[in-house]
Amino acid sequence: MAENTSIIIKGARVNNLKNIDVEIPRNKLVVITGLSGSGKSSLAFDTLYAEGQRRYVESLSSYARQFLGRMSKPECDFIKGIPPAIAIEQKVSSRNPRSTVGTSTEIYEYLRLLYARVGKTFSPVSGQEVKKHSAEDIVKCMLEYPEGTRYTVLAPIVLREDRTLQQQLEIDMKQGFTRLEVNGEMMRIDEYKPKEGDTVFLLIDRMTASSEKDSVSRLTDSAETAMYEGDGACLLRFYQSGGSPCLYRFSTKFEADGIIFEEPNDQMFSFNSPIGACPVCEGFGKVIGIDEHLVIPDRSLSVYDGAVVCWRGEKMGEWRDMVIHGAEKAGFPIFTPYYELTDEQRRMLWEGTPYFEGINAFFKMVQENQYKIQYRVMLARYRGKTLCPKCHGTRLKPEANYVRVGGRNISELVDLPITELKLFFDNLQLDPHDADIARRILTEINSRIQFLLDVGLGYLTLNRLSNSLSGGESQRINLATSLGSSLVGSLYILDEPSIGLHSRDTDKLIHVLRQLQQLGNTVVVVEHDEEIIRAADYIIDIGPRAGRLGGKVVYQGDMKDLQKDSDSYTVRYLLGEETIPLPEHRRPWNNYIEIKGARENNLKGVEARFPLNVMTVVTGVSGSGKSTLVRDIFYRALKRELDECNERPGEFTSIGGDLQNLRNVEFVDQNPIGKSSRSNPVTYIKAYDEIRKLWADQPLAKQMGYSAGYFSFNSEGGRCEECKGEGTITVEMQFMADLVLECESCHGKRFKADTLEVKFHDMNIYDVLEMTVNQAIEFFTQHGQKKIVKKLQPLQDVGLGYIKLGQASSTLSGGENQRVKLAFYLSQEKADPTMFIFDEPTTGLHFHDIKKLLEAFDALIRRGHSIVIIEHNLDVVKCADHVIDLGPEGGDKGGNIVATGTPEEVAKCAASYTGQFLQEKLHPSLP
């Protein structure tokens, strides 16, 4: 490859990279793959992105640089041909409670512009459109009447400068006006005696309808006079033979029904601006108030059965009794579960009726009595974030929702799923003038909506909070935003964009990546998904194994150059030389935990059985309700049953089944095992306790009086006090990246010299922490330390033999963190029967890692545990004993159980997308 058509990296040595040379073709779709821990992210993010970003920042002025982060140069000999780099990672990009899907994709900004430019304001009183009128509108109204129809031009009497009506009329007479219309009758001004309650207008002119030029000119003059005298208002009263007079009101002000409305502008629709934000919640949509979920935690109960928890007990129960006694007259159903009540029935319960007082009245009484301690405690117990009573969660002041486009206000649009929003804009009809104004705005909106659909996010709504998105969703929104920004000549680096994406949507994602590349960008993707690897223009495989045994380029080239018998695990799996085998049989099951009536978010009252002592996989397209069912309902409800935890589960009717067969439930996520640099795998799995005891048992340690605690780098004693057991000292630099220097006292060894003199077979405590898990197992096996080997073995079993015992947990990937936790549970041999729940455990895992992960799952099940996994990866799904497939689509069109049973049974279900893709995995064709 020529230098100007490729990015050339020479001698990359970041983390475990072994002085590698890589050439990456520019303006292509490039996939970097390899085992977990092989060095993919070190190449993509710590080398490529770090250097691309650093060079871009260095090209800016020193003034601009002071506002940007300090960037250090990655460890490599040189990098050539690198464009400005943009990283799109699996991180929830915004913790800002105001940030939504709409604002982060810029669709909401364009919606604001659309409503400001072509929105029509409608009066909440009459529903008529609010307009500003001109003399031309008045002439147009007159021309609609037959020739010769009599009419009058009137103006309301405006009292200026604190005058009385009599004083104003005298001034009008001096200006040449002679008549008034009083309560519909004509009268001379000098004959009128003002009375309270009279409707009085100043007569400007009396005319007959005519299309003649002189008549139109006269009306125009009279209308302008009326608007001047009437402070912008003018009235026409037409007198038709045989009918009552018709009155038309015109105004140069933006008003209707006696209300002056605000003219639409883009700030009016911004909840981040004081001009548009709801004055009560200040644009958050929620306020601290009485939380419905705390007052009615179990929505499957009726009012009669005690749904309202604050009305339990003898004294407060009087309020419940009041509702029961008045319910028949009020037409309120006291035996209906709360979740089945209509909006009107819920309003009756909260706001009360003439026959009983509601929950709001109860809490008003509590507030009035909060000088008593028991009432203060009660009020605090039921307070929480609740929907704003003024804007009802729209975040905008009411005036913003008087404006409509295509019959809908902006709050209704942001509540629609993206799929329905697309239909709305596809069918939007505007008049030619408005269509011309809105053409460019609609183009931007439609293209961004299409990008969101292309990355499989059609189930989201624009008002969904950014901080409630999963890492995969957040990354794909950033990807859609990048496409919308249409940058050219950049380097995009993505970290597993297929996370959380069903196989059905992978083709769309590949199409989006291609679009980004075809704009003229280089797209580098760290990925394990087989379809995306096969779709790439160029593949770089880092390996052959992980950690110290990785960091080399084992393959670079395109799909057609793949060779058999390669050192690359990726190549072997792609060519079918290695596979993840199907289990020989599916485990049978009789015991289960059952959830009934799950209806949180988009779940449609589903019933699901989670078998015990087998591996259950919950599948479905993005947004179908998997996480809601498993994490929000099943996990929290089960935890509440077993541990009496306070975390509120989502809405469901009941949990039952063989609960007596379980003792614990564990949710194993990918969060770091410890946030400090001191936390490491060997301490997490409790193996370091045994290692410290072994060193404390050595003759020199006993002679010096060193206890096991002396060999800890977390407490004073044997650790180096200069660096507090860190091994490094961080020097903060003002305008440069912080310097991390090796501690001069211990030379990076974390312990005092006398501590390091204690040795076990020529190895001191620092030497052991520097060993990989594989090396440590070999060392301790040779010297008969079975206890320590037994503790370390699970780390090797889950495929983490390459990590150092003392490696800081902050340097582990999400997948590695999850497997360290899994190793900890595998090490608990005598643990009580536990339900383990995993959320996409294959994130960041190569085919070869998945094989080891499945072996670890089998080991847990053999020990009497049960496993439930939320997963899209078909290699895991095909190995399940039981599959629960949710769908059929995401969002409102999901939330149902489409199929359950063994993978073979699900594959036969025509309505299941998962089933369609499973057929190929269960009956693979030759590669």
Predicted regions: what is each one?
Residues 1-927:
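Conserved phosphate-binding elements of NTP-dependent enzyme cores
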